[in-house]
Amino acid sequence: MFRGATLVNLDSKGRLAVPTRYREMLYGESQGQMVCTIDLHQPCLLLYPLPEWEIIEQKLSRLSSMNPAERRVQRLLLGHASECQMDSAGRLLIANTLRQHADLKKEVMLVGQFNKFELWDEQTWYQQVKDDIDAEQSTQEPLSERLQDLSL
């Protein structure tokens, strides 16, 4: 399980040094094989260990290519999916097209989200956190049933 937000740097080649605390887990779970794709709703990237991505691919394969909305999701997620292999120094090369999509610069946030990571431009991440907190504090909407059961 991946959790927490960590500031990491992209080098001049677009490589991301995976924090040490995740490396052993990623080598054990996926031999360092990862898949990176776009997020459909946020200006960030999604980074999955290969076995987790394969579950997503199975779900996507069950969608109908005859349904325009389902085909669009397939096209966006699969069309942007890029395999990346962690090197011996624990670095992942993030494809240039993906870096451009999320406007990633040198400093990026690696955000653990259970079975995957999100990759955010640092400033965009901090703005998103602020916006999310503001939205939670100002919302008048009742919590969904599942959120009501979440006891923090």
UniProtKB/Swiss-Prot annotation:
Keyword Repeat included in the entry's annotation: yes
Pfam family, one: MraZ
Domain SpoVT-AbrB: 5-52, 81-124
A Gene Ontology biological process term: negative regulation of DNA-templated transcription initiation
Keyword line: Cytoplasm, DNA-binding, Repeat, Repressor, Transcription, Transcription regulation
Protein's cellular compartments: Cytoplasm, Nucleoid
Gene3D superfamilies attached to this UniProt entry: Transcriptional regulator MraZ domain
One GO location term (cellular component): cytoplasm
PANTHER family: TRANSCRIPTIONAL REGULATOR MRAZ
General function of this protein: Negatively regulates its own expression and that of the subsequent genes in the proximal part of the division and cell wall (dcw) gene cluster. Acts by binding directly to DNA. May also regulate the expression of genes outside the dcw cluster.
Chief location category: cytoplasm
Listed NCBIfam families: division/cell wall cluster transcriptional repressor MraZ
Record protein name field: Transcriptional regulator MraZ
Subunit comment: Forms oligomers.
Organism: Pectobacterium atrosepticum (strain SCRI 1043 / ATCC BAA-672) (Erwinia carotovora subsp. atroseptica)
